[in-house]
């Protein structure tokens, strides 16, 4: 059957019990039947079905997939008998926006509320770029993504991350495939700093898998004082167009909350009365305990972006100058500058780090092309699109190691210092002939010799780098149509 999820959505819209665009106050009241509140008024929800994404239960249908169709047909009667809230919003607010419809099972009003809060208002037209049907009460767990129709069926999960990413996954790839730009799993921020005596605005995109410090570096203001400043646009997904504009996709934020005690700038956004805490332990007096991970290591919040002191008035970054890829690999220096657009895209497609799984908490080496677990096929299109953008916009691209250089820990304060130093162009570089990129040897007055992997590994460095290079080349050659990038690592 072609476009079976789209057909299911059509039947739901024609026959199911649907309440259209319920106001947030109603959704909050309905959610309070099973949720609590913090002392500041934030809604606090504990998921009953799922507390993290399930990539192993996510299935994407591109053209024909009989197994996919059977899963949808098996759920058909159950879905059409359910009652739904219909939430009409937009991913993005500018000329790269997509109209979306979330059909959320009525028994889970907090999911409808979070969708309303997270995405932008854009009126009711009856025509949508993406549609998701979300039925958490279903007995089996599946995220069924139908690429051609841009429709998703979420079954058996009440974790908001699945609903949110059902739209953002498709928006990123739709932007790429429509040649509107390229969707990127990256945070965006603007620096206004003094460079060589004159004020300059520098737009930065920060990429990184979970656990690499992306949120920490995104909300960092470096203690700058007027006329210098930092403004935060987005923390997760942007669409970078051919003019260098990084279009924001979300009105608010969805951060992990275990970082809140260290990132005080996030606190007002997470504790805002309109915020929604998801699987955060709340004490009997209404105080959230962000350090208690007994419910899950993946506790999150739908946080109110405008409450962050350094939030920008706009979610769109109007000019992108710098890309920063965060990694945690012991062979990498604290900061490296990539020397060509091809090398930059090679590292983009490597998407490598050590990361901690959301539930198990066990560090493991990983490679995810584009630092983006939501990138759909054909992945080579993202590589070629970014290559064209880096060439045409003359962007500088860096790799920042936020883990260890060999076994020496790289402190977060050093990473923050390096980010500001590269934005201010206050870094001395030296070519690492073995790696083929430039490494920072001094930044903003700080000597980095003690973190140079070549010195730390000593005589074994060449062997370590050679093994790493061969491993990287093998990975890149496994991605169709980008094997040529193996020559640049």
UniProtKB/Swiss-Prot annotation:
The keyword ATP-binding applies. Pathway: Carbohydrate biosynthesis; gluconeogenesis. One of its GO terms (molecular function) is ATP binding. Its EC number is 4.1.1.49. InterPro entries: PEP_carboxykinase_ATP, PEP_carboxykinase_C, PEP_carboxykinase_N. It is found in: Cytoplasm. SUPFAM superfamilies: PEP carboxykinase N-terminal domain (SSF68923), PEP carboxykinase-like (SSF53795). Substrate binds at residues 53, 159, 300. ATP binds at residues 185, 208-216, 258, 300, 409-410, 415. Pfam families: PEPCK_ATP. It catalyses: oxaloacetate + ATP = phosphoenolpyruvate + ADP + CO2. It is an enzyme of class 4 (lyase). One of its GO terms (cellular component) is cytoplasm. Its main location: cytoplasm. GO terms for biological process: gluconeogenesis. The keyword Nucleotide-binding applies. Keywords: ATP-binding, Cytoplasm, Decarboxylase, Gluconeogenesis, Lyase, Nucleotide-binding. NCBIfam families: PRK09344.1-3. Belongs to the phosphoenolpyruvate carboxykinase (ATP) family. Involved in the gluconeogenesis. Catalyzes the conversion of oxaloacetate (OAA) to phosphoenolpyruvate (PEP) through direct phosphoryl transfer between the nucleoside triphosphate and OAA. This is Phosphoenolpyruvate carboxykinase (ATP). It comes from Aeropyrum pernix (strain ATCC 700893 / DSM 11879 / JCM 9820 / NBRC 100138 / K1). The lineage of its organism: Archaea, Thermoproteota, Thermoprotei, Desulfurococcales, Desulfurococcaceae.
